[in-house]
Each structure stands twice: as structure tokens, then as C-alpha cells.
């Protein structure tokens, strides 16, 4: 299958940005490495930057483009260096665009480290489990622990004037088993 050319009728990214602009909305473009090709992990960040550069070249002038979102759902402090590089690459195109990531809330140090990245604007925190039918998940990630990490994370980003979002994941698998069916 051939890739759609920017501006062509098959260009879904361009279409989404044009529709967003028409309705007064903005959008973050999701960026990650090219998962259609095998590559060592050490090359993933350079692949991500290459894709981001291509997206900026194609869509950087679109009024609805608000920024870039790294959808790799990392956890732990190892994610910090990747986000620092990702955000710096995005801001190299335009200091005014937004950057975002969605880490798991499972390391209290991660909240502070991500908040310290000046170029990171939005942190979308998520728990491995925030609401689950699975008893093993509730034992592993009790609601109180998720609440504590969410509070810590929101506090860390508030001090640095960042946008903090969190979401609840509702899992529907095994519900019949737990409902007694």
C-alpha cells in the first residue's frame, strides 16, 4: 500500500487538521518511532525525531496544529531522558507548540523528574489500573496507591505551571465472571 501524499484526498492527518481548524479546535499529533521496521532500541529516538521532522515539514503551517504527543506509555525514571529529547526536538521547530506524554503512575520520582523538563507542557498521567474488575490488579495497584501517585504527580506539575490530566481506565474483560454469570 502506498503512503498518502500530504494534501491528497487520502491524507487523513491533513484532513483532520483542516476539520479541526474549521471547527475551532486544535490537535496534538502523536509521534513515535517507526514500528513497521525492526530496529534496536538505541535507534528509536532518532526514528521518532525523523518522523516528527517530517510531520512538521508537512503540517507545521496548519493553524490547528497545537503540538506533538509522545504516546509511548513509559514508567519509571528511564522515561525522563526520552521525554527531554522528544520535547527539545519538538520545541526546535517552534518554541510555542505544546508537548505531551502519558506515563504510568508507578514511580513517585518520575512525577518530579518530568515536571522538571521545561519543554514538557502536558502530562497525562495514567495508572496501570484505576478501575478494574480483576482482583489481581486491585491487589497489585490498590486505589489508594493510584490516588497517592496521582496527587503527587499533579502537585509536581502544578508547581511548574504545566497542564496535568489523568484518566480512568475501565476494563470490561472478565466482568461476567465477577458478576456471577
Q: Could you say what each language-model-derived stretch is?
A:
Residues 1-181:
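Glycan-processing catalytic domains of CAZymes
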Amino acid at each position: 500500500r502506498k503512503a498518502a501524499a500530504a494534501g491528497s484526498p487520502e491524507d487523513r492527518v491533513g484532513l483532520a487538521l483542516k476539520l479541526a481548524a474549521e471547527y475551532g479546535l486544535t490537535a496534538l499529533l502523536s509521534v513515535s518511532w517507526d514500528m513497521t521496521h525492526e530496529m534496536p532500541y538505541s535507534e528509536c529516538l532518532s526514528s521518532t525525531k525523523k518522523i516528527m521532522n517530517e510531520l512538521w515539514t508537512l503540517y507545521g503551517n496548519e493553524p490547528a496544529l497545537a503540538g506533538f504527543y509522545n504516546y509511548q506509555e513509559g514508567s519509571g525514571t528511564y522515561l525522563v531522558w526520552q521525554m527531554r529529547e522528544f520535547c527539545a526536538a519538538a520545541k526546535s521547530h517552534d518554541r510555542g507548540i505544546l508537548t505531551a506524554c502519558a506515563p504510568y503512575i508507578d514511580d513517585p520520582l518520575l512525577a518530579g523528574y518530568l515536571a522538571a523538563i521545561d519543554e514538557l507542557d502536558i502530562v497525562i498521567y495514567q495508572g496501570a489500573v484505576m478501575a478494574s474488575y480483576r482482583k489481581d490488579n486491585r491487589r497489585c495497584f490498590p486505589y489508594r496507591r493510584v490516588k497517592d501517585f496521582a496527587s503527587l504527580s499533579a502537585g509536581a506539575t502544578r508547581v511548574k505551571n504545566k497542564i496535568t490530566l489523568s484518566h480512568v481506565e475501565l476494563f470490561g474483560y472478565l466482568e461476567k465472571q465477577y458478576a456471577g454469570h
